[in-house]
Amino acid sequence: MIPALFLAAALGGMLRFLLSKIGPYVGTFIANMAACVVLAAVRDASPLVMAAVGTGFAGALSTWSTLAKELGTLIRQRRWAMLLGYTTATILGGMVAVWCGLQI
């Protein structure tokens, strides 16, 4: 189980790195939405799949710390409309992404 977890986490981390090259906000948003879909999709999987794909891949792909940094930057820059839009899109988008994952 541990090698599968490590491999999946490495793949999730590499994908997040590639998505970060799109730019701030967009790359983070895509990574977090994709992780929501993946995690919801494997909810009933075997413990090995849940550990590898859910914890490893989706855990490494998603990024709470980068989201917090980006929101903090928007607050410091007093970009209130962007802050509200990004926060709302992330919350609502996450719910839609989970719903999509549950349909798989």
UniProtKB/Swiss-Prot annotation:
What controls its activity? Na(+) is not transported, but it plays an essential structural role and its presence is essential for fluoride channel function.
Task: Provide the transmembrane region boundaries.
Answer: 22-42, 48-68, 82-102
Q: Which domain of life is it from?
A: Bacteria
Q: Name one cellular component (GO) term.
A: plasma membrane
Q: Which GO terms describe its molecular function?
A: fluoride channel activity; metal ion binding
The reactions it catalyses are: fluoride(in) = fluoride(out)
Per UniProt, which keywords does this protein have? Cell membrane, Ion channel, Ion transport, Membrane, Metal-binding, Sodium, Transmembrane, Transmembrane helix, Transport
Q: Cite the binding residues for Na(+).
A: 59, 62
Give GO BP annotations, semicolon-separated.
cellular detoxification of fluoride
Membrane topology type, per the record? Multi-pass membrane protein
Write down the Pfam families for this protein, in alphabetical order: CRCB
Q: Record's InterPro entries?
A: FluC
Localization: Cell membrane
- Alphabetical list of HAMAP family matching this protein: FluC
Function field: Fluoride-specific ion channel. Important for reducing fluoride concentration in the cell, thus reducing its toxicity.
Similarity comment? Belongs to the fluoride channel Fluc/FEX (TC 1.A.43) family.
Query: What protein name is recorded for this chain?
Result: Fluoride-specific ion channel FluC 2
